Amino acid sequence: MTDYIEEIEEQDDDTGQLYEHLRIVVDKGQVPVRIDRFMTERLQHSSRNRIQKAADAGFVHVNERPVKSNYKVRPGDVITLMLDRPHHDTTIEAEDIPLDVVYEDDALMVVNKLAGMVVHPGAGNFHGTLINAVAWHLRNMPSFDANDPEVGLVHRIDKDTSGLLVVAKTPEAKRKLGLQFFNKTTHRSYNALVWANFAEDEGRIEGNIGRDPRDRLRMAVFPPDSETGKPAVTHYRVLERFGYVTFVECILETGRTHQIRAHMKHIGHPMFGDERYGGTEILRGERSSTYKAYIQNCFKLCPRQALHARTLGFVHPTTGQQMDFTSPLPQDMEQLLDKWRNYIKGLAV
């Protein structure tokens, strides 16, 4: 049985994936054979050398433990691995686009992505992306080539999500950072404004995430024990309540495509302004024309899903030092929260 696992970080549907994640359960009748040979025979698009490189880098696990390429598979083994995606045909050109650099050294840079910017060239978005801006920023660094898959973005966030991303300048940095995402040792938290009030102050959402059979542009949530979708866990904590909407912090335990957006929709709290997941409907509040006009003004103030990648933490790939970064809320979300605070104050008068 072969189970294809989603990438390590949320991504927009109009961009390609950074990595290919796979999960394979070895059949009961399988005879012992080297894992590099076993995987090559099952993945027609992958060479044996590609599998060996992944194993050497620590990206091949059996029963949750890293193994080398000479490991011999056994019946019932659960194999998980991460492979670099074959490089795209699109040539990445350096473009003079403003870039908000939060931190930079010889090995990496942390950037604060604006909402509305695609992270990587893909179908319909060949220019104006974050990596085009990175290529310009690093144009005087001879060792960095934006077209080299061994450097560059380590993870992604959606086009209309703002916030922190880490970019690797060297192959070693990308390999070590990628391994941290693979092993789930990074820390990432998001701030979001969602519809409706919560009965509790914090909670945990567990549910597999896979393509919505009714809409291929959306993800849907399936039971945790289902064979459909990929395991996903989101933790949330209420930061501020506005009656009809709630400001929350979300912490990723996994990182599936549209994970926070799909999970919040699933528990009845769609992201405010998230058109794809029903967040542009007036889901809570009054029926008056005044209230409806107020909500429409809110949507205009923040014309996207109100989701921001607030914090990012990882171990530096060269120094071994813990690195933690925080990005302030962007202006559109800050103004949106202020508008709701003023609205609630008006109700209290």
Residue ranges and their predicted role:
Residues 1-349:
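RNA pseudouridine synthases
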